[in-house]
Amino acid sequence: MGIKEIIVEACSDDIITATEAINLFSIITESEVSKVDKDFKPKESMKLSSFQKIHITESIIEEYKSKYPDLKHVRCKDTDTYKCDGYMWLDGKNLVCHVGSCEYLDDKTKWIVSLEITKNYKGHGLSKQLIDYAVKNMECKYLSVDKSNKLAKMIYDEYGFKVYQEDKKMYYMTLDTNPVKS
């Protein structure tokens, strides 16, 4: 039985509340994902262009959210405040990675709001390619990253993003020399 199943069982047996389960799962997955491995050896390089790219729609993202729980935070619905855009790359029927953006209508800033590479495709050099795609093709210049996600922060730093603001939980980063958002 995996960690997720154990937490679900504990929840259903009223050992812990749903909120406690969510917090516990976040702590566990956060510690697995955000570590910077000093002895990391890259795997064989993969090219983003070798996978099938599809434009994200609300129905497509909802379909994949059921198969890939890590996508639960991905949104693809425009509002009065922002306009969403995004792409997924598939290897056959398997999700390789995705990037989502939002353009805020008030100041026209474009943000990377979600960027994920699925487990089997991590370590193959896709992160920089995905950021490149978001910056060059989607014109994103802003992002926020959780302070506990040290690996993502390191990747964004290496790409050239700079912190222009932070709070207790997040770094707000940009490629702009004079950030619009404050």
What is each residue range found by the language model?
Residues K128, S148-E166:
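Conserved active-site alpha-helix within GNAT-family acetyltransferase domains
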Residues S49-S114, T118-K119, I131:
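Acetyl-CoA-dependent GNAT
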Residues T118-N120, H124, K147-S148:
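Active-site acidic-Proline motif in GNAT/NAT acetyltransferases
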Residues V8, S34-E62, H73, V180-S182:
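Conserved N-terminal entry element of GNAT/NAT acetyltransferase domains
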Residues S12-T19:
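Charged, low-complexity interaction regions
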Residues K41, K162, D167-S182:
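Terminal substrate-recognition subdomain of acyl/acetyltransferases
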Residues Y121, G125-Y133:
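Conserved acetyl-CoA pyrophosphate-binding loop and the N-cap/start of the following alpha-helix
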Residues L143-M154, K169-L175:
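Conserved beta-strand-loop-alpha-helix junction that forms the acyl-donor binding cleft
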